[in-house]
Curated annotation (Swiss-Prot):
Residues 608-621 have a biased composition (Gly residues). It comes from Syntrophus aciditrophicus (strain SB). The modification Phosphothreonine is found at residue 198. GO terms for molecular function: ATP binding; ATP-dependent protein folding chaperone; unfolded protein binding. The lineage of its organism: Bacteria, Pseudomonadati, Thermodesulfobacteriota, Syntrophia, Syntrophales. Residues 597-637 are annotated as: Disordered. Belongs to the heat shock protein 70 family. Induction: By stress conditions e.g. heat shock. Residues 627-637 have a biased composition (Acidic residues). The keyword Cell membrane does not apply. This is Chaperone protein DnaK. Keywords: ATP-binding, Chaperone, Nucleotide-binding, Phosphoprotein, Stress response. It holds the Pfam family HSP70.
Length: 637
C-alpha cells in the first residue's frame, strides 16, 4: 500500500495532510498556503480554475464561479436548504433528472459530487507535488451529521477524482484523534465544530488509545456562509437606505459584498469595528456610487444572534444522548474557522460552563486527524481504536406509514441489525421495503434512502410469512439493506446509494472525463512551461546581445536577432513543438555569442589580484579544486 493522505473537504476551505516519520504534516499548496479555497471556476476560454486562482477572479466571473458546493451535495433540488442557497447564489442551481440539485455553468450541468471532485484533485496534486509520488489512497472527512446520501456522494467525489477512499471519517472524530493522540489520561471531551457550511457537536470518551464517540448531533446547513449572508443583507439594506439603490440584482456587486463581508467578519474577531469601503459599487444617472459603511462588533453580533442561538439545541441533545451533563465534560475542543468569533466562544462557554480549549488549529486539525486515521489504516500508527457512531436512526416503513427503527442513532459502527416482519394482506406476493433515515415517528417525515421489492412470496394468510430485514452499516457510515423470506430462502439486497445520487455508470463516465481533463491540464502546464522557458531564454540572449553584440560579426548578430523574433512569435501561439523548435534554433544561433562572453569573462579574471598568492586568478599552489570556485566567486562579487 502506498502513502495514505487525509483530506478535509470543507465548505469554504480544504486541507490535506500526511503522516511523515510518525507525525502528521499539513501540506502547503503551490501558492504556499496550508488551506485551499473550495472554489471552482470555469473561464470563457474553457479553462478550469481551482482554489485561490478561482477565488481571485470571482468578482468578474461570478456566474461561473462555484463555491460552498458541500451545502448542495447529496440534497434534493426541492429541499428548503437548496431553495435557500439558490436564492442567494450567483451561479445557477437547477434540478437534475433524478431530482438532485445540480449546478449549471457555461451550458453544462455538473453534479455537486463532480465539482467536489475537482477540489479533491487539487488536494491530491498538492500532496503528490510534496511527496514526489503518485497518490491513490485517501481518508476523506465529512460532517458527523451528514446523512447516507451525503456520505455516498462524498465517496463518489473521491472516486471521480481518482482516489481510492479507504474511509469516510466524521470531522469531529478526526479532530478528537488529532487532539488526543498523545494524551495519556482518560477524559470526556466535546468537539464543537462550526465551519463554513456545517455545524457538528460530538461527545467522545478518550482513554488508552480508544476514541469512543458517545453521541453526535448538528446542523448540516449552518455555518460561516450563513453569517456572511446576514452581513451582506445588512450592507444591502443600509446602502438602499443611504443611496436609494437596491443592488441585489447586480451579481458583480454582490460578489464584492460577499468578499467584503467575509473580511469584515474576520477583522471583527480581533477588533471592535471595521470600515467596509467599496468604491464604484454601482452607478445611476447621477454617476458612480461608493459604499462606505462602519460595522461594529456589537452590530454584527446582533445580526447573527439567531444563528448563534441555533448552536445550543444540538449541544444539549448530544449531552442528553450521551447521558452526561456539562460538568462531566473535561475539555471542549473548538474546530472550524467560525469558532474564532468571540461571540461563538462565549456561547460555548455558556453551554458547557467552561472555557473552551484553543490549543488546536481550527482550520487544520480535521485534516491532521484524517492523516492519523490514514496512518492507522496503513499500519503506521499503532494502538489506536476509533469507535464512531451513526448520527441518525435507520428503519423501514411499516403498516400505517409508521417508521419502525432498526438501528437507533448514536449506535457504534460498523453494526448489523435484523428484525422479522410479515405481510399486511392475505396472499401478498411481494413486499416493498422503504428504507428511511431520521428521528420522526411517521415515515413521511423522514428521509427516504431507497426502496426495493422482495418478490415471490408464496400465498399465505397475512402475518404468516416471515421476512427478515437486515441493516448493515459499514465503517464509513454507509448503509446496506437486505430482505429475506425465511420460508423460501429468497433474498433481495441493495447497497443504499440514496433514492437518487449518481449511478455506477455515471461515476465511471465522470472518472474517465476527469482523467482526460487531467491530461488536458498536463498539456496546458507543459505549454505554459515551454512558453516561460523560451521567453526567459529570448530575454536573456537579448540582454547579452546589448552587452556583447560588438564581439560577434554583423551576420551572426542578425541570425541571433532573427532567432529571437521567431521565439517571440512562437510563444504567442499554442504549438508546443514550434516553441521548442524555435528555442533550439535560438540556442544554436547564440553559441558564438556565448563563446565571446566567456572569452571576455576569462580575460577579466586572468590577472593576479591584490593580496593573492602567485598563479592565475590568485590560486595558490596546493589549493583544492573547490577553492577555485570560491576565488572566482569572490572576484566576480
Amino acid at each position: 500500500m502506498g502513502r495514505i493522505i487525509g483530506i478535509d473537504l470543507g465548505t469554504t476551505n480544504s486541507c490535506v495532510a500526511v503522516m511523515e516519520g510518525g507525525d502528521p504534516v499539513v501540506i502547503a499548496n503551490q501558492e504556499g498556503n496550508r488551506t485551499t479555497p473550495s472554489i471552482v471556476a470555469f473561464t470563457e476560454s474553457g479553462e478550469r480554475l481551482v482554489g485561490q486562482v478561482a477565488k481571485r477572479q470571482a468578482v468578474t466571473n461570478s456566474e461561473n464561479t462555484v463555491y460552498a458546493v458541500k451545502r448542495l451535495i447529496g440534497r434534493k433540488y426541492n429541499s428548503k436548504e437548496v431553495q435557500y442557497d439558490k436564492s442567494i447564489s450567483p451561479f445557477k442551481i437547477s434540478e437534475a433528472p433524478n431530482g438532485d440539485a445540480q449546478i449549471e455553468v457555461r451550458g453544462r450541468a455538473y453534479s455537486p459530487a463532480e465539482i467536489s471532485s475537482m477540489v479533491l484533485v487539487k488536494m491530491k496534486q498538492t500532496a503528490e507535488d510534496y511527496l514526489g509520488e503518485k497518490i491513490t489512497d485517501a481518508v476523506i472527512t465529512v460532517p458527523a451529521y451528514f446523512n447516507d446520501s451525503q456520505r455516498q456522494a462524498t465517496k463518489d467525489a473521491g472516486k471521480i477524482a481518482g482516489l481510492n477512499v479507504l474511509r469516510i471519517i466524521n470531522e469531529p472524530t478526526a479532530a478528537a484523534l488529532a487532539y488526543g493522540l498523545d494524551k495519556k489520561k482518560d477524559e470526556k471531551i466535546a468537539v464543537f465544530d462550526l465551519g463554513g457550511g456545517t455545524f457538528d457537536i460530538s461527545i467522545l470518551e478518550l482513554g488508552e488509545g480508544v476514541f469512543e464517540v458517545k453521541s453526535t448531533n448538528g446542523d448540516t446547513h449552518l455555518g460561516g456562509e450563513d453569517f456572511d449572508q446576514r452581513i451582506i443583507d445588512y450592507l444591502v439594506s443600509e446602502f438602499k437606505k443611504d443611496q436609494g439603490i437596491d443592488i441585489r440584482s447586480d451579481k458583480m456587486a454582490l460578489q464584492r459584498l460577499k468578499e467584503a463581508a467575509e473580511k469584515a467578519k474576520m477583522e471583527l474577531s480581533s477588533s471592535m469595528e471595521t470600515d467596509i469601503n467599496l468604491p464604484f459599487i454601482t452607478a445611476d444617472a447621477s454617476g458612480p456610487k461608493h459604499m462606505n459603511i462602519k460595522l461594529t462588533r456589537a452590530r454584527m453580533e446582533a445580526l447573527v444572534e439567531e444563528l448563534i442561538d441555533r448552536l445550543e439545541g444540538p449541544c444539549r441533545t448530544a449531552l442528553k444522548d450521551a447521558g452526561l451533563s456539562p460538568k462531566d465534560i473535561d475539555e471542549v475542543i473548538l474546530v472550524g474557522g467560525m469558532t474564532r468569533m468571540p461571540r461563538v466562544q462565549q456561547k460555548v462557554k455558556e453551554i458547557f460552563d467552561r472555557e473552551p480549549h484553543k490549543g488546536v488549529n481550527p482550520d487544520e486539525v480535521v485534516a491532521v486527524g484524517a492523516a492519523i486515521q490514514g496512518g492507522v489504516l496503513g499500519g503506521e500508527v499503532k494502538d489506536v481504536l476509533l469507535l464512531d457512531v451513526t448520527p441518525l436512526s435507520l428503519g423501514i416503513e411499516t403498516l400505517g406509514g409508521v417508521m419502525t427503527k432498526l438501528i437507533e442513532k448514536n449506535t457504534t459502527i460498523p453494526t448489523r441489525k435484523s428484525q422479522i416482519f410479515s405481510t399486511a394482506a392475505d396472499n401478498q406476493p411481494a413486499v416493498s421495503i422503504h428504507v428511511l433515515q431520521g428521528e420522526r415517528s411517521m415515515a413521511g417525515d423522514n428521509r427516504t434512502l431507497g426502496r426495493f421489492d422482495l418478490v415471490g412470496i408464496p400465498p399465505a394468510p397475512r402475518g404468516i410469512p416471515q421476512i427478515e430485514v437486515t441493516f448493515d452499516i459499514d465503517a464509513n457510515g454507509i448503509v446496506h439493506v437486505s430482505a429475506k423470506d425465511l420460508g423460501t430462502g429468497k433474498e433481495q439486497s441493495i447497497k443504499i446509494t440514496a433514492s437518487s445520487g449518481l449511478s455506477e455508470t455515471e461515476i465511471e463516465k465522470l472518472v474517465r472525463e476527469a482523467e482526460s481533463h487531467g491530461e488536458e491540464d498536463r498539456k496546458k502546464k507543459e505549454l505554459v512551461e515551454a512558453r516561460n522557458s523560451a521567453d526567459a531564454m529570448a530575454y536573456g540572449v537579448e540582454k547579452n546581445i546589448k552587452e556583447f553584440g560588438d564581439k560577434v560579426d554583423a551576420a551572426e548578430k542578425a541570425r541571433i536577432e532573427d532567432a529571437i523574433a521567431k521565439v517571440r512569435k512562437a510563444v504567442e501561439g499554442d504549438d508546443i513543438n514550434a516553441i521548442r523548435s524555435a528555442q533550439d534554433e535560438l540556442t544554436t544561433a547564440s553559441h558564438k555569442l556565448a563563446e565571446a562572453m566567456y572569452a571576455k569573462t576569462s580575460q577579466a579574471g586572468a590577472g593576479p589580484q591584490p593580496g593573492a598568492g602567485p598563479g592565475t586568478g590568485g590560486q595558490g599552489p596546493g589549493k583544492k579544486d573547490e577553492d577555485v570556485v570560491d576565488a572566482d566567486f569572490e572576484e566576480v562579487k
